[in-house]
């Protein structure tokens, strides 16, 4: 599911901003071509609600590297608004997941945008596997 979220974020950014930007999900140690976005998953969390229901939390950070040093802050502020609008609702597996706790800031002239996606998933459990742990007890004995 992590890769599906990252893929969907990348696709949405590509649809919104087009081919004039680079989109990186893997680390780039050198030769980062700007303007570009890097997309990372921070610390996903899964909590079990039952044997088949799981609450998932997927915090994503998007870094935007601007190539225009003359209007860096002004361009980055506008970019933050556009990215948030683009990623507020993320299509994944024929459903829309709404981003929450959206915030952004500038760090060392790089725009950082944080969005958390929360959703519930179900796990398919084979009925035969579930039935193997049942034991019959005589409830009429006192």
State the predicted function of each range:
Residues 1-24, 44-142:
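Charged, amphipathic alpha-helical segments and their flanking helix caps
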Residues 24-33:
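Short acidic low-complexity segments
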Residues 33-41:
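A short, hydrophobic beta-strand-centered structural micro-motif
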